[in-house]
Amino acid sequence: MYAPIRSPITELNESTPSSIPVATSYATCSASFAKLVALLVDDMAGLSIVLSEIYIYFKLLFLIVITESIQNKLEDIVKEYKKRGIDLGIITNVDEVSLFFDTSQYAEAIKKKVIEIVRQSGTGRAKIDFKTNGYVIKFAIQRGYYNRNTIEKLKSLVDYLHEQKIRCGYEIKGDLIFVMSLTDFLQKISEDVKEKLKDERVKIASKQEYTKYIVVIKVEQ
């Protein structure tokens, strides 16, 4: 890519006789010195460019190696959560790795269960609004579509989800509201990521993409 860097001394020797007469004038010495300085400046500029390229190359190489290290550790987390029925994924860029998981399937499964409970209660077909606010997902069951049997079944569902470390509950304010919070779910994965990458020099942040219910845990170097 680059021509060999020629030493300024080599350049000077090639263009200067092997022995300089004693009578060499001051002007000749000054010219030789000026040429030496010019060669030094040129070579240092070239060396600077080469060093810059080497720095960039090693920086990119370093980032790629570290990214692979981080990615391998994140893949371990993906496998662990896969066993629990939770799908995670990894997005890799040159300078960052993002771990993401899709909460829609997780929330939709619970939504279907709530609908099933309400329909089985014998009170007719329930209309359930699926809303999000931060990490809180609400299922609003309209008035007249729930009874004691419905509430008992929802209590059982809430108890089951609590056993799965999912914070949720219900409240009755005219309509019956079933509330599920994914905050703890996200926090648990974030803690696992931090623990797994504790030996890496990374910054970890998380955010939620509200449009697709995608939660992203970003790992930056």
UniProtKB/Swiss-Prot annotation:
Keyword flag Acyltransferase: no
Name of the molecule in the record: Uncharacterized protein ORF221
Keyword match Ligase: no
UniProt feature coiled coil, ranges: none
Membrane-crossing segments per the record: 46-66
Source species: Acidianus filamentous virus 1 (isolate United States/Yellowstone)
Record's keyword terms, sorted: Host membrane, Membrane, Transmembrane, Transmembrane helix
Membrane topology designation: Single-pass membrane protein
Ranges in the topological domain labelled Cytoplasmic: 67-221
Cell compartment(s), UniProt: Host membrane
